[in-house]
Amino acid sequence: MSLSKQVVPTHRVEIAPNSESTCKMDHSNYQHNGLITKIWGTAGWTFNHAVTFGYPLNPTSDDKRRYKNYFISLGDVLPCRLCRESYKKFITTGKTALTNEVLRNRHTLTKWFYDVHNAVNNKLEVDYGLSYEDVVNKYESFRAKCGKPVPTVKGCVTPLDHKAFSFKKLYYMDAPIVSLDKVENFVRIARMRGISDKYFCFLELATVLNGDFNELKKQSSWEYRNKYCQKKIRHMRENAIPSIEEQGYWKGTPTIDELKLLLFLCSNLNRTEVNDAINNVERLESTHYIEN
């Protein structure tokens, strides 16, 4: 069996059920604030990527004008002031500028919006490791395909098996990635905090593959990794679980839940926050709070 086909068994790990929120807030004092980006952002990206994949293969002058106006206007209506300012800057400068060449055909427009999405992620210091081809494969799976005509239904009827495949693609979410060399800084502290061995299985696979995400994506455990990480992230958000310890012995280092994410080469933290956490772990070691 080739290295790329090797699979290290990954034990299934469970996530505790959500606790009911007791937060009661008077929203009247916040009516002029924007909306939380992590709530509307994913849906916004999905819709606007879909808009670009609906662009004609050979657009007319009217098509180009309408789509250009749409993407320019988008910068005026995003429900977050900083997002609006950032988006407007991206579409007017550098390789993410919305030029006439961008509107040449479907390929150029979809590639442009992919670059915009990456530029935003880079500014936020997060990485998902998705290539343009990955995005194309996902959104092309959403394209309607006609099966046998049904007398009682007008228009194209998409076969159920194709719909099922498309919905699986829609609901399958990629989780953020963190490089193996960064995660290795947290392995010792994860073991010291009593995290079960079953959480280290994916890390063992990543080590065998030298942290190569292209190879990791070929493994059957990659899909499970993404599903687990997305469930863990959701669990932390819905239960207000922090990513960094705020007090006590481990202050400044990742919480238990965040360490479990890191062992799957994932994190809620951005690049700067991961580096800060590494520095805090090293500081503990240097001051002998963590015994050798």
UniProtKB/Swiss-Prot annotation:
Disulfide bonds: 80-83
The organism of origin for this protein: Acanthamoeba polyphaga mimivirus (APMV)
Keywords: Disulfide bond, FAD, Flavoprotein, Oxidoreductase, Virion
Catalytic activity: 2 R'C(R)SH + O2 = R'C(R)S-S(R)CR' + H2O2
Protein task: FAD-dependent sulfhydryl oxidase that catalyzes disulfide bond formation.
Enzyme class at the top of the EC tree: oxidoreductase
The protein, known as: Probable FAD-linked sulfhydryl oxidase R596
Alphabetized Pfam families for the sequence: Evr1_Alr, MIMI_R596-like_C
Molecular functions (GO terms): flavin adenine dinucleotide binding; flavin-dependent sulfhydryl oxidase activity
EC number: 1.8.3.2
Domain ERV/ALR sulfhydryl oxidase: 33-139
Coiled-coil segments on the chain, per record: none
Keyword Oxidoreductase annotated: yes
Cofactor(s) for this UniProt protein: FAD
Compartment(s) of residence: Virion
Presence of the UniProt keyword tRNA processing in the record: no
Major location category of this protein: virion
Entry GO CC: virion component
